[in-house]
Amino acid sequence: MKMIVGLGNPGSKYAKTKHNIGFMVIDQLCEKYNVTLNKHDFEAEYGSFKYEGETVLLVKPLTFMNDSGRSVGPLMSYYQVGIDELLVIQDDMDLTMGKLRLRQKGSAGGHNGIKSIIAHTKSQTFKRLKIGIQHPQKSTVVNWVLTPFDKDGAPVINQAIDQACEAIDDWCQNDDFMKTMNKFN
């Protein structure tokens, strides 16, 4: 079983903000695979589909970004998902707008949602799919991540979401994250 977690903040107020790029990817995967996030336990909404016989959980933690691990850890335990089968989709200010970067493991890199997942899983060895939102030029970090993409950024991000879904499909299909990294990084 694979578990794909998109990071974001719950509520319509945050729906189109940069920090919610993980939720946006999950939404597109739900559309592609006809999944409804109809389960509401573990402070998350989630659903599943079968990919060539393997169950894939799509998860949106509802704890707000900085407490995402409070949802992810218990879900992993309940469904007996190994740390090697967890993929977390996150925004990354150190990457240019729309750039994808896949990683096998790593530190939180200043991302509080990732920091929370590391704390609750007691591991840094889970997979990441990072999508660049670039660093703010003039605004503060909080204002930057909690504002929507502008008219120039929106098409770039829509393309990045498509690429992220392709990368996830690739990983589900070949079950070799290193191959997927080499293809999409």
Curated annotation (Swiss-Prot):
Site label Stabilizes the basic form of H active site to accept a proton, positions:
D91
Cellular component, GO, one term: cytoplasm
Q: Which GO terms describe its biological process?
A: protein quality control for misfolded or incompletely synthesized proteins; rescue of stalled ribosome
The record's EC number reads 3.1.1.29
Pfam families in the cross-refs: Pept_tRNA_hydro (PF01195)
Query: Does this UniProt record's set of keywords contain Kinase?
Result: no
Q: What class of enzyme is it?
A: hydrolase
Q: Which UniProt keywords apply?
A: Cytoplasm, Hydrolase, RNA-binding, tRNA-binding
Checking CDD domains in the record gives:
PTH (cd00462)
Q: Which GO terms describe its molecular function?
A: peptidyl-tRNA hydrolase activity; tRNA binding
Residues annotated as catalytic? H19
What PANTHER family would the database entry show? Answer: PEPTIDYL-TRNA HYDROLASE
Q: Could you give the subunit structure recorded for this chain?
A: Monomer.
Q: Write down what this protein is called.
A: Peptidyl-tRNA hydrolase
Native source organism of the sequence: Latilactobacillus sakei subsp. sakei (strain 23K)
Give the gene name. Answer: pth
